[in-house]
Regions:
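C-terminal lobe and pocket-closing loops
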Residues: 121, 205-273, 302-305, 319
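A ligand-binding cleft/hinge motif common to bilobed small-molecule-binding domains
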Residues: 95-104, 166-170, 197-231, 308
Length: 320
């Protein structure tokens, strides 16, 4: 018995020593930042300068790798099942919260991923074609009550999908969901009028609105955007509590050593203070919300529970 305990003690000591040595040498090779969304979207745009700034803080290259698909779940699962050595990270967004309730997953992000740091939030805009007869939100709902209306999304269980489902549910109308591989892929059909409406994050939507090709008829934030001061919030339009937006944060496999987790957290928070990242966040109308890992992890679980509650109450139902 004593011999078995002794062997076990040696094994535990060896593991702890190896982990400590690994943390002391970290990072000694490039770090991969997986972006599980389509190229050209807000996550892709924000992840690049943040990765560069993190690399400068760590003294090692941090490069981005796009792994889109299934509303972000393919890339998230890849990271969740990667070695927990700090060399594979996830640049996550809202879909990491919503997928728990609205998608069939082969992993559980709540237990298989560890929050490293929170980054920012970004409001969304409800858009219709610039050529559409729909001039405001009331027009949209009236149209939905008398004819076929559809809406595009950046993919199943993404924010743009669930916001559309929430409008459909609360307006008690029938709206068909048409998923795309990223919001950018949906714009040609929206502009041409083949899609009735869609939600997109402010940074991606604003150039399209300013060009006149699409029309903004509502925003999802609690107050009007300074970039679109004439566009009402959904709260104003009779949809109280519709304060939903897209968040961004960084995660790692859950078994990552604490020392490495702390180094990454410091690097993310340092990156958020660099002029390059500050300017990039401002360019897409994102609000910086730096959060340490423990705080961000708690917030993430609360956000996940919020969507789970909406699913349970039937406030949001996924039709396809």
């Amino acid at each position: 018995m004593h011999k078995k305990l002794s062997i076990w003690s040696v094994m535990v000591s060896f593991f702890l020593l190896s982990s400590n040595l690994s943390a002391q040498n970290y990072p000694n090779k490039p770090i991969k930042m997986v972006v599980p969304y389509a190229a050209g979207g807000s996550a892709d745009i924000l992840s690049r300068p943040i990765s560069i700034a993190m690399g400068q803080a760590l003294g090692q290259t941090v490069f981005t790798e796009s792994r889109p698909g299934a509303g972000g779940n393919i890339g998230a699962e890849f990271v969740a099942k990667s070695a927990p050595d700090g060399y594979t990270l996830l640049f996550a967004s809202l879909s990491l919260s919503t997928s728990v309730s609205f998608a069939k997953l082969n992993f559980d992000p709540r237990s298989d991923l560890k929050a490293i740091a929170g980054i920012a939030t970004l409001p969304s805009v409800l858009l219709v074609s610039g050529k559409s007869n729909i001039k405001n939100f009331d027009d949209l709902i009236n149209e939905a009550k008398k004819s076929n209306v559809n809406f595009a999304s950046a993919g199943p269980t993404t924010g743009s999908h669930l916001f559309g489902e929430l409008i459909k549910s609360r307006s008690k109308t029938d709206m068909a969901h048409i998923p795309y591989k990223g919001s950018g892929a949906a714009y040609p059909d929206l502009i041409a009028g083949r899609i009735t409406f869609m939600f997109d994050v402010m940074g991606s939507a604003l150039p399209q609105v300013k060009s006149g090709q699409v029309r903004a008829i509502a925003v999802t934030s609690t107050k009007r955007s300074s970039a679109l001061p004439d566009v009402p919030t959904l709260n104003e339009l009779g949809y109280p509590g519709f304060d939903v937006g897209t968040w961004f944060g960084i995660f790692a496999p859950s078994a990552i050593p604490t020392a490495i987790q702390n180094r990454l957290e410091e690097a993310v928070l340092a990156a958020l203070n660099t002029p390059e990242v500050i300017n990039q966040l401002a360019s897409v109308m994102a609000e910086p919300v730096p959060r340490k890992g423990a705080d961000f992890g708690r917030w993430y679980l609360e956000d996940t529970e919020k969507w789970a509650k909406l699913a349970k109450e039937g406030a949001v139902k996924i039709s396809d």
